């Protein structure tokens, strides 16, 4: 109860006069006037005990909150009518109030956003101390009296207005503190740990998981018992059986029998003991045999490994390139050796030049299997992979438009050497080097012959090239050892051009070596190296040989023309042939690299073969009384295949003497020009 004098200046308009009443001395009956504001069902603050036992939700919203409040107020009115005292002790109300009613009151007092899990005793004590330190001692005493009166007014049965949202009200703090007392009346002051929301949610989730797990296990046990019970009492088992189990499993499908235990006799004990010992002895014997077999197997593997590495150490030198590789067929890890010519200047990419090193247990030897043909085992690859180049010469029959075989290159083949090649790994490496060399030679020949089709060169298939000349035909073919032409013609008689075919094959191989050396020189001299070879300038294998043969035919034809149009007409004339030397390139000047100098020297050793042939045919004409005519012809092949004739003629040494200096590429024009010179200048002068 409060009183307020508006004319008094010393009274606070907010607090008024505070009275302290003993609730135990007041026994006035509560007025039952329905028009009283205390009995209004629309009161904003209901008595705390009206929280509703059935509703455990913390916050009510909208119409539900209003309906709930009205029902609680009606219950409180009925409760208060049975009371004789006007004011009740707050402790008697809140101390015995259940948590499901007390917690919503605390949440409404604390305001929105407050969580009950964050409330603890230490925080309440701090709030009480903070309120005590804000005011003076006198003011605190007055406030205590006022608070005591407020408690009686707020908690009393008259339902005076109470602000439950006042967070600074110490009465609420004391009520909350009183609620935390245990059954013995002692306050739990030892709780220092504050549980966060995340910890609470985690523990709640763990608890639910354990509960669900226990429920599942108990359900399974119940299902098992129900199914087992259905065989005895079907109705009882079906009543406790789940619908799913009742649908899936037929009732009475599970049964159980009680088997009586019969103690074994002494004799059975002895027999069982003997049987156990027998099984143990048999297991020990089998384990012994298994260990002995494993030991023998490991010993054999270890011995094979020792032999393998000893052979590797004896057969492989420091110059060989050894590395690890995985077999394509079996996936087994093996050692591989590089036998190709990539480091020597080879640009062949169709064969990597790698062979797997395998230990042949049967022959106790090491076998080299090319990585590109690793499907072959043992020594089968010698007959299936080994290839060689063969050159055959065919001579044209004059009476018939046909050719006859007049020469064939011979392959070095010795049965004893082949057997040694399969046993010695060094011989196998040499054999593989020959194979890849022959394959690259055929590859470069086909690449060059693609530009020589207009000169009678044709590519019949991927392993055969044919060069046709007026009177001869050359056939270059890559064959394997099991080819029919090799097997069926091993005992052929020697032919007239066999030596020539062998020399031609040697020349082809030497020209490939020259290409290797030129590639190495380009790699050393150029910072980027030579990646692709230029067919016109770098690949010179067929053209030098073809140029030599065609140049010899051109020279014979030119001599025949000179004989017919000059020598036979001009008596006393003769012809002199002179080879024109090519100027040496100045490649070694200002070169400090010894490797380049050495390569240039080795390449110049093949100049006799690689240089474009040039011949000077000088015709010696008879001298006249006043004139000394000179006639000379220069024959050369600028691109190894075509012929170019350079003719010079001078009628005398005088300044006004007639002279000619012209070049022809057609022999018919040469005939006409020689006939013109002889008829107009040589015979006329002679006459």
UniProtKB/Swiss-Prot annotation:
Which compartments is it annotated to reside in?
Nucleus
Write out the GO MF terms: DNA-binding transcription factor binding; RNA polymerase II complex recruiting activity; RNA polymerase II core promoter sequence-specific DNA binding; transcription coregulator activity
Ranges of Basic and acidic residues composition bias in the record = 56-70, 136-147, 167-183
> This protein's superkingdom?
Eukaryota
Q: Where is this region: Disordered?
A: 30-70, 130-189
Q: What is the effect of changing residue 353 to C?
A: In SRB4-1; suppresses the phenotypic defects of an RNA polymerase II CTD truncation
Q: Which GO terms describe its cellular component?
A: core mediator complex; mediator complex; nucleus
Classify the main location: nucleus
Entry-linked Pfam families? Med17 (PF10156)
Gene3D superfamilies named in the record: 6.10.250.2620
Q: How does it assemble?
A: Component of the Mediator complex, which is composed of at least 21 subunits that form three structurally distinct submodules. The Mediator head module contains MED6, MED8, MED11, SRB4/MED17, SRB5/MED18, ROX3/MED19, SRB2/MED20 and SRB6/MED22, the middle module contains MED1, MED4, NUT1/MED5, MED7, CSE2/MED9, NUT2/MED10, SRB7/MED21 and SOH1/MED31, and the tail module contains MED2, PGD1/MED3, RGR1/MED14, GAL11/MED15 and SIN4/MED16. The head and the middle modules interact directly with RNA polymerase II, whereas the elongated tail module interacts with gene-specific regulatory proteins.
Q: What family classification does the UniProt entry report for this protein?
A: Belongs to the Mediator complex subunit 17 family.
Q: What is this protein called?
A: Mediator of RNA polymerase II transcription subunit 17
